[in-house]
Amino acid sequence: MMMQAKAVQRVFILGMDGAGNFVQQAETPNLDVWLPRGSYTFDAKAEMPTISAECWGSVLHGVQPDKHKLNNEKAATLSYPSDSPFPSLFRLVREQQPEAKLASFSSWSPINSGIIEDNLGVHKVSLPDAELVSSLLVYIEENQDVRLLFLQLDEPDGSGHRYGYGDDCPEYLAAITTCDELIGSVLKRLEKLGLMEDSLVVLLTDHGGGGDNKYSHGSAHPMDRDVFWGCIGPGINSGLLKGPVSITDTAAIAALALGLTLTQQWDARLPEGLLDDTWASKSITIVDNKTAAAEESHNG
């Protein structure tokens, strides 16, 4: 049985696309304040290949790309199979908590149309970054009992493709700064509404860029694969994580906080040192073999 030390009422996964770990070189006054409030790292790993569908698919489905089988073309043209053995967090919540409010705000529309399953009653919005966050802020005001909310901002990746990725590309760094402002507005609204006290927030990006190709990504080069990742909330330690972290691990802490039961072994793991000792148990129940999917260790 999974036990929680403190009740988490809602989970927010807030991401920007293609930022890598260049948030360290960009002006990010909001991340600079918020990341240290929880556990964080600038050395998390994106999945391979370091491409959006593969990576966001792993964030939301808890498994590596060879299992969820997503790529950009599939995500843009096909619905994710509703009977897949590797469901998204959204499908798991809907099946196990039928009345839960679910929302996905994604500037890159294939996340809503091809990575998250159809017909789950998820409130889905796809708009340019600034309009998207405006819509999200209205939604939060009116739906403070939302159970799971995902946000993807796209412009760092767009700027990287147009102007180049890296700390020598001012347009790219400026796009990261803009996304920092937008995510900061979400976090400040959550705090103003008093929602941070019983919410879990993950802050992340899916991949970087500029490794093998200044204007693209997809390789295992550190510029493509090394990314920032952070988690804030009840029972989460504060400070730098010293062990390995994968973006896929996002699903493990979300599932643990949401009280979900899995039917398949996940690749997602709880990063070492993430949870404080107020968590009574550090595992997620798997109904088919009764073993823990997310012990507080990471298998790399």
Please give the residue ranges for each predicted region.
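Active-site nucleophile/metal-coordination loop of metallo-enzymes that catalyze phosphate/sulfate
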Residues: 5-10, 20-98
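A substrate-binding/cap region within the structured catalytic cores of diverse enzymes
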Residues: 80-135
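Second-shell loop/turn segments in exported
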Residues: 17-22, 45-46, 75-81, 123, ...
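Metal-dependent active-site segment of extracytoplasmic phospho-/sulfohydrolases and closely related
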Residues: 11-15, 30-31, 178-217, 254
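Polar, surface-exposed loop/tail segments
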Residues: 260-296
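Active-site His/acidic residue clusters
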Residues: 109-123, 137-181, 185
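Substrate-binding rim/cap in mid-to-C-terminal beta-strand-loop elements of soluble/periplasmic
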Residues: 56-60, 218-261
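Loop/turn elements at helix/coil->beta-strand transitions in domains of secreted/extracellular proteins
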Residues: 7-11, 37-41, 96-103, 144-149, ...
